[in-house]
A protein has these predicted regions:
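Low-complexity, Pro/Thr/Ser/Gly/Ala-rich linker/spacer regions in secreted
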Residues: 55-73, 157-160
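Short, exposed coil/turn segments at beta-strand boundaries within extracellular/luminal domains
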Residues: 41, 53-62, 143-148
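A short glycine-rich, aromatic-capped structural motif
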Residues: 159-268, 296
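Surface-exposed binding patches on compact interaction domains or structured appendages
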Residues: 5-32, 70-124
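A short beta-strand micro-motif common to beta-rich folds, especially ectodomain repeats
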Residues: 43-55, 131-142
Length: 398
C-alpha cells in the first residue's frame, strides 16, 4: 500500500494471516501486506483493512484483501521440469501423509525423483525431457492407504486459452499428450483425446488406442472388455495398485479417493458434491485457474461455433470436428469416446464427442454429447446420463 500523508495515519483490521509491515505513521510510507497460511492450508478468505488519518475532510478508506486457494487436483508440468507442488486440496486444506509415490503412468520413464517434504507440505517430481503424458501421484499414510492423489500432466508446451463467446476454454483436453495447430493431424491421433472422468471424481481413466467411427457402437460391433485389448496400455506401480478394476460396490467420496484405479458402476448421492456447478469443487479435475464447464457454457460454445466457420473433419477413422473461429484461433474438438457407466466398456471411439459438464438435472449429469447445438441439455438417443459414466474433460477458465 502506497500511503501519501503529512499527518498521522493508522491501519486497522489486520488479522493473523493478513498483517501489515507498519500499522501507523506520520509521513508517506510504503506498507507491505504480510500474508501467511495457518499451517493447515491456504483457504479462501478475505480481510478488510481500514486506513484513516487526521487530515481534515478525508474519509477513512477500506482495502479488501482476498486470498484464494491455489490447490488443484491436476498439476501441469513441462517436459524436463522439476516441479514442487503443495500437498493440498482445492479448498486449500493440506493433506498429511508419510510418502509420495506414483500409481500409474503412460510411460515408465515419465516421472522420477518423487519426494514428499512433510515440513513444507510439498511434493516434488521431475518430468522426463522428451516425453509427454500423464501419471497419477498419490500421498500415502503409514499403512499404505491413499490419502489424496493428483494427476501430473506432462506437456511439451503449456496449454493456452481459446476464447469463444466470451468464455475462455483450454485449447486441449485434460491429459492430452499431443496438441497441434494442424487440426487434421490432431483429431486423428488418439493421444490428443486425453483422459476420462466419472462424475464427481478427480481420478481419471485411460481411453482407447483404436479410433473407428464405423465400429464399436450399437449394432455394429461387440464391445471389448472394459480394460481389455482396446484400452491404451499404461504402466502400473505393482507395489501400490493391482491395475484397473471394475467394482459393483457403491462409489462414495472415500472409496473413490482410496481406490483411484477402480471404476465403480454404482454411485452414491454424496458424489453429487464432488464437483460444483460454476465453481471449483473439492474433486474438480482441472488445473489451477480452471474448472469443469457447466451445461450452459457448453451450449454457448456449441451455439457459437455452429455459426462461426465450423469445419467437420470427417475423414480417416473419426468424426472429430475443428473450428476456425471468426474471432481468431482454432478450437479442436476430438470425438473422444466414453466408458459406459454400468460396465466401463469403451463406446464410440472416434465417432462421438462426449464431455463432462458440472451440471446435474434431476440428480443426473448433463454431459455434452456430440458437437451439435442442443445436445448439451437434451437427452439424446444414446445419452448416458449416469454418475458412473466416464467422459472426456475440457476445462474453462475460472
Amino acid at each position: 500500500l502506497n500511503l501519501r500523508a503529512s499527518v498521522a495515519w493508522k491501519i486497522e483490521g489486520a488479522t493473523d494471516w493478513c498483517a501489515v509491515s507498519q500499522s501507523e505513521g506520520t509521513k508517506s510510507s510504503v506498507v507491505k501486506l504480510l500474508l501467511t497460511d495457518d499451517g493447515e492450508g491456504v483457504r479462501p478468505r478475505s480481510a478488510t483493512l481500514t486506513v484513516s488519518s487526521e487530515m481534515e475532510g478525508v474519509e477513512p478508506q477500506q482495502v479488501t484483501v482476498v486470498q484464494r486457494s491455489t490447490g488443484a487436483n491436476t498439476v501441469v508440468v513441462r517436459a524436463g521440469e522439476t516441479r514442487a507442488f503443495p500437498a493440498r486440496r482445492t479448498d486449500g486444506a493440506y493433506v498429511k501423509g508419510v510418502a509420495a509415490d506414483w500409481v500409474w503412468t503412460t510411460d515408465a520413464e515419465l516421472l522420477s525423483g518423487l519426494d514428499y517434504d512433510a515440513s513444507r507440505n510439498e511434493i516434488t517430481c521431475t518430468a522426463a525431457k522428451s516425453k509427454q503424458g500423464s501419471g497419477l501421484v498419490a500421498l500415502f499414510d503409514a499403512g499404505g492407504a491413499v490419502v489424496w492423489s493428483w494427476l501430473v500432466w506432462v506437456v511439451d508446451k503449456m496449454p493456452s486459452d481459446v476464447t469463444v463467446g466470451g468464455i475462455a476454454w483450454q485449447d486441449r483436453n485434460v491429459g492430452a499428450e499431443y496438441h497441434s495447430t494442424d487440426p487434421k493431424a490432431c483429431v486423428q491421433d488418439f493421444r490428443s483425446y486425453g483422459l476420462f472422468y466419472q462424475w464427481g471424481r478427480k481420478e481419471p481413466f485411460i481411453g482407447a488406442k483404436i479410433l473407428s467411427k464405423n465400429k464399436y457402437y450399437e449394432g455394429h460391433a461387440e464391445y471389448p472388455d472394459a480394460f481389455g485389448a482396446m484400452t491404451r496400455e499404461v504402466v502400473f506401480n505393482a507395489s501400490r495398485t493391482a491395475g484397473w478394476q471394475i467394482s459393483g460396490e457403491e462409489m462414495t467420496a472415500a472409496t473413490a479417493n482410496g481406490n483411484p484405479t477402480t471404476f465403480y458402476t454404482r454411485s452414491s448421492a454424496a458424489m453429487s458434491e464432488g464437483w460444483t456447478e460454476g465453481g471449483k469443487g473439492l474433486n474438480d479435475p482441472c488445473p489451477v485457474g480452471y474448472r469443469v464447464p457447466t451445461a450452459a457454457e457448453w451450449q454457448s460454445l456449441l451455439a457459437y461455433v455452429d455459426g462461426n466457420a465450423a469445419k467437420n473433419q470427417d475423414s480417416g477413422d473419426t468424426y472429430s470436428r475443428w473450428y476456425a473461429l471468426n474471432s481468431g484461433g482454432t478450437l479442436i474438438g476430438p470425438s473422444t469416446m466414453f466408458r459406459k457407466g454400468d460396465n466401463g466398456r469403451i463406446h464410440y471411439p472416434g465417432r462421438s464427442a462426449a464431455y463432462c459438464s458440472s451440471t446435474l438435472a434431476g440428480g443426473k449429469p448433463l454431459p455434452m454429447y456430440d458437437w451439435k447445438a442442443g445436445d448439451a441439455t437434451g437427452e439424446g438417443t444414446y445419452y448416458e446420463r449416469k454418475m458412473t459414466t466416464a467422459y472426456g474433460m475440457r476445462c474453462v477458465k475460472e
